[in-house]
Amino acid sequence: MEDKNNDKEKKTDVTFEDDEDNEDLEDNSSKYENDSETDQSDLGDLPGDAVDRDDDIDEPFISQVQWPQSFRETTDSYTIAASPIFGSLRSNPPSFYRASRSNLDVESKAPLLPERHDDSDKASATQSAWSHKGSFAEELPIGGYGCSVIQTIFNAINVMAGVGLLSTPYTVKEAGWASMVILLLFAVICCYTATLMKDCFENKTGIITYPDIGEAAFGKYGRILICMLLYTELYSYCVEFIILEGDNLTGLFPGTSLDLLGFRLDSKHLFGILTALIVLPTVWLKDLRIISYLSAGGVIATALIAVSVFFLGTTGGIGFHHTGQAVKWNGIPFAIGIYGFCYSGHSVFPNIYQSMADKTKFNKAVITCFIICVLLYGGVAIMGYLMFGEATLSQITLNMPQDQFFSKVAQWTTVVSPFTKYALLMNPLARSIEELLPERMSENIWCFLLLRTALVASSVCSAFLIPFFGLMMALIGSLLSILVAIIMPALCFIKIMGNKATRTQMILSSIIVAIGVVSGTLGTYSSVAKIIRNYQ
């Protein structure tokens, strides 16, 4: 009897808590209504020009498409790598998880399209209140919590400076020293488009993520398009990691093979499969915060590789003696794809912006981040090509002599780093697919495991189908990264800002769109043609 009474009390408590949440939402809704009525009544006492200025203020952005609901949560893993007090950005999980109804622990799912209500103002206010409660970035008091400028720079570099560093010397081989001009040009353009995204956030309250920008600019189809681009880009990074592991482990353990049931696996295929088996348990994890902390080592890994290249050239008996052509026109499209890949961190920049304690310093942090990345990419590109010349391979680590200490440091750093990032890249795609499944199926643990296993297996198959690291990177950069980092931010800025943008901003944004379309087309065509040529 006591147990039954306790159960009843628990049920009563849960119901009471739910009622409190509902009352909070209703109170917020009525508060917004009262505030709006007060504002309207006050307008009658104001001069006509003041009324006109109030009419110019945009209404808060409220998403009308509920897919994907998990995008911000799953990409926030990148912004807690250098969070203050090591994870304080997650200090208030209950309100955060209430906002993400797609979480597997939630008992019910929201429809992809919200139901229409007669009282649209009240519904809008309620949704705004719900959005506010679910935004941990808005809950962070300025000056008390949130990332500082240095932490923001660290997080941004952790997102951008990755495996693209390995292929920068190869771009000099393919395109000549003129590729350095493309390196600088794309850095300036991508840095500018990152600041355009900030302007979009500040123009309308309620724009939190990159998909929100797409919807605010072009409606639900804009949101879906950007989501598809982002998820495809994240998935392609996972494919690139499998290729990377196969190539570098083959260099460390040449001649390795396996004969099993009449099938012979060479070293690249064997290590690709082993890599998938190692990362699979990390993809099965529901809480990826530990992995996100480990992924913060990506900045250290990038620095280690750059330092290793320097010391290998100065003390390893290799030297910097090679020279090259000023420009190789046939390789320019390849360089476009590689550097498009290198500077594409825009999918996570919104999360980084929202995590800042002082958002007014976002531009300063982004500019600093891009300057550091230019120095890293440019330094390794120049040193790597001067060391190996026309013998430079698609990954600088494959050129390094096996008997050198700094070669081992760079190679093993390259091998270990992707294991801390693979799950973080695959998780957003897996969560978005779960949102589209029926509720009973998506909440089943076997569905959870099988879906992620299938995604990992498909990434391995894709890596085996296109096992060309450099060409795959150039294709990703030309086809996806240029769209994500150059074309779409500029287009969305033009659409969202409209007459509020200055003439200079509109002209620059239009030029950037044109550059993105031309360079993306050239790079994609060149990459696809070279991949086909490798199969002929």
Curated annotation (Swiss-Prot):
Keyword Protein biosynthesis attached: no
Cysteine disulfide links: none
Annotated stretches, region: Disordered: 1-68
Keywords for this protein: Amino-acid transport, Membrane, Transmembrane, Transmembrane helix, Transport
Membrane topology type: Multi-pass membrane protein
Record's compositionally biased regions (Acidic residues): 15-27
Ranges of Basic and acidic residues composition bias in the record: 1-14
Subcellular location: Membrane
Transmembrane regions listed in the UniProt entry: 146-166, 177-197, 224-244, 265-285, 300-320, 332-352, 366-386, 408-425, 445-465, 468-488, 506-526
Superkingdom to which the source organism belongs: Eukaryota
Record's keyword annotation contains Transport: yes
CC terms in the record's Gene Ontology section: membrane; plant-type vacuole
Entry's Gene Ontology BP terms: amino acid transport
Family: Belongs to the amino acid/polyamine transporter 2 family. Amino acid/auxin permease (AAAP) (TC 2.A.18.5) subfamily.
PANTHER family given in the database record: OS05G0424000 PROTEIN-RELATED
Protein name, as recorded: Amino acid transporter AVT1A
UniProt gene name: AVT1A
